[in-house]
Amino acid sequence: SAIRDFLISKGVGSWRLFTIFPVGRAASDPAMLLSSDQFRQVMEFIKDTRQQGKIKASYGCEGFLGDYEAMVRDRFFSCNAGITVGSVLCDGSISACPSIRPDFHQGNIYQDDFMDVWTNRFDRYRQREWMRTGPCANCKVFRYCRGNGMHLRNEDGQLLMCHWRKLRNQPIDAVVTEPTGT
């Protein structure tokens, strides 16, 4: 709350908060990642900060949060990487988002026409059914999260972290099936 109060005292109007996801150093150092209880505390902090109305706090585009969605964001979660967001990285790589690993790059502006890449590639981003594997195979909230953010997938496309399960203190491989007929 000291950081929040400092930002308010400086007249900052908006504050977007993120958490660390298990990539890079955080992949091999569990101390860098929040526990389920700590993650819920962050959501409660953002919710309380929003209710106070002194600064517009919101949670980043990390993943689907279930019941917290409307309390910590202005919009329902959607990973728009490769759908409405495209990026050109410093090396010329054409990606959807700078947080997404190189395995998902779609081209390079030094060899490819950006609009051609945008129009004719990015299928992996736009057609999400391939994500219905592993913990997402029969998950009851897949229709809302669509397999989570692309940056939360490893080089093989496997999910590294599920925010919805983390908030429920469930391991990523817990079976949370969707009722049949829905």
Regions found by a protein language model. Name each.
Residues 1-85, 90-95, 99-105:
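Radical SAM enzyme [4Fe-4S]-AdoMet core and its adjacent flexible, acidic
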Residues 99-182:
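Flexible mid-to-C-terminal extensions adjoining Fe-S/redox cofactors in radical SAM and related proteins
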